[in-house]
Amino acid sequence: MSKVIGIDLGTTNSCVAVMEGGEAVVIPNAEGGRTTPSVVAFTKEGERIVGQVAKRQAITNPDRTVISIKRHMGTNYKVKIDNKEYTPQEISAMILQKLKADAEAYLGEKVTQAVITVPAYFTDSQRQATKDAGRIAGLEVLRIINEPTAASLAYGLDKGEDQTILVYDLGGGTFDVSILELGDGVFEVKATSGNNRLGGDDFDQRIMDYLVDICRREHGVDLTQDKMAMQRLKEAAEKAKIELSGMTSTNINLPFISATPNGPVHLDVNLTRAKFEELIADLVEKTVGPTRQALADAGLEPKDIDKVLLVGGSTRVPLVQETVRKILGQEPHKGINPDECVALGAAIQGGVLAGEVKDVLLLDVTPLSLGIETLGGVFTKLIERNTTIPTSKSQIFSTAADNQTTVEIHVLQGERAMAADNKTLGRFQLTGIPPAPRGVPQIEVKFDIDANGIVHVSAKDLGTGKQQAITITSSSGLSEEEIQRMVKEAEASAEADRRRKEEIETRNQADSLIYQAERTLKEFKDKADQNDVDRIEKAKKELQEVLDSKNNDKIKEKMEALSQALYTLTTKVYQQAGAQAGAQGQGAAGGQKQDGNVYDADYKVVDDDKKE
């Protein structure tokens, strides 16, 4: 059976891990990094690049670079590049393809199965979108698991004692808090809460807004109108945020950020940690409510928590750590890597599903209540939040009007009392109900939530036995046909990328061969046959002429001709050198005088020790 990889598909960075020898290990990417920026870019030549290389060129190519796509998962948002629209699922699939390729290169085998993590507070449509992204990337997604739960697996797999832990997960774009009970290989989530629109990206934005404001006040320039300048600000803000985790002050120096009629504009700002904390104070404060909510839902006090795990790069910010200390009254546990533990946990879950890891049971919960709209626009909950999944719940409803033959089931997710204030997951109709006074027909609505947290709903008329069932696909979801089309496009893109890589490698080999030919001619021109020299010159010229043609077969053909010409010349030169050396050796031996007589002689070994 092929390996099951664990993927943390993050807002700003992603990570992939696998079980090796009973341990979860992080797989480094092709560039040698342990995490991969969740950045996709399209060059003007149509080449698609992902990861560190894409992030590096973002300043010069801001219009064709996509960042933080995870924030748009489960929505109708589209990215438009070169008159082609891409869904968040497709962009995410490109990141997953890169992680898959890096894993295959590391393992030396094909990878087809994965466990992918999502924020605990992701809605059904966001989870479904993540699963679709995996399919488009050519992966069978065995399980979607929550990021805090994955982190707890990475932390607690080798811990024997029973304990209650709180996972505070603040990443690039999302915030989650989960409370779990660990013991005897059982990881049971007691409560979860969060905010899907809060993370390190928002911290960066606050620094950017601050810098834009300074530039406007001091130079009268609005940088928001210049995409390239904003991309430079984004990179500088992220760098400053990271530096302020270890230093109390940092310098942001951006020369030639813009220009005015009076000349170029240079931005040179000293940002202190105190000022940074002032800029983000209200954002960090937004994590307090969900943390207290999770404690209340679990029926626990801060003193009942044995360990606090910090997950996600944004938890390195000192103000965040100080806030956690204030809420929970204890020092957070620093024993896990906040950037890697989620992927490691996903790999462990992959090991559980593949049968590699024994005696581990993961019991997760649904983060939001599920229900339907009933008379008067009321939201009637069928499954309360923090219910352990997988789960199933049914309830009997009736018609709202006399002789009603059709019932529309409006499925929602959320915590508000009125249907309009909650998130619509989908709608479907149960038809063919026999005419009857209102309140007489009995309609059973059944909810199923699978282990991935994905919802399935059915409605049945108990009088006629008629049933209608759907797996929720929200208005932002993809149809099976769309997914299949995207899978084919992704495969075609992967093939195009492979060919492009092959072209580059062939070109590099050709450049190297031309250089080798020039060195050989320089070294042996005086000793070689002129015909052989001419043949190399001709073959070299022909290879140089086809180099820009992008015709790989033609380039290889001309490389072969040049290689052959070089081989012929060097063989002859070395043979010639060998023959000359042999002739000189013979001459030296023949030059010694001999008298023609041969003498026989006896010899005796003398032992010096016995000499007298």
Curated annotation (Swiss-Prot):
Q: Which Gene3D superfamilies match?
A: 1.20.1270.10, 3.30.420.40, Actin, Chain A, domain 4, Substrate Binding Domain Of DNAk, Chain A, domain 1
For this UniProt record, the keywords arranged alphabetically read as follows:
ATP-binding, Chaperone, Nucleotide-binding, Phosphoprotein, Stress response
Iron is among the record's keywords: no
Regions of compositional bias (Basic and acidic residues) in chain numbering: 601-612
Region: Disordered, residue numbers? 578-612
Q: Does the keyword Aminoacyl-tRNA synthetase apply?
A: no
Q: Highest taxon of the source?
A: Bacteria
Coiled-coil ranges from the UniProt annotation: none
Phosphothreonine modifications at: T174
Query: What InterPro entries does UniProt report for this protein, alphabetically?
Result: ATPase_NBD, Chaperone_DnaK, Heat_shock_70_CS, HSP70_C_sf, HSP70_peptide-bd_sf, Hsp_70_fam
Q: What induces it?
A: By stress conditions e.g. heat shock.
Gene Ontology molecular function: ATP binding; ATP-dependent protein folding chaperone; unfolded protein binding
Which family is it part of?
Belongs to the heat shock protein 70 family.
PANTHER family, from UniProt?
HEAT SHOCK PROTEIN 70KDA
This molecule's function is given as:
Acts as a chaperone.
Question: What's the name of the protein?
Answer: Chaperone protein DnaK
Q: Which organism is this entry from?
A: Moorella thermoacetica (strain ATCC 39073 / JCM 9320)
What lineage does the source organism belong to?
A: Bacteria, Bacillati, Bacillota, Clostridia, Moorellales
State the encoding gene: dnaK
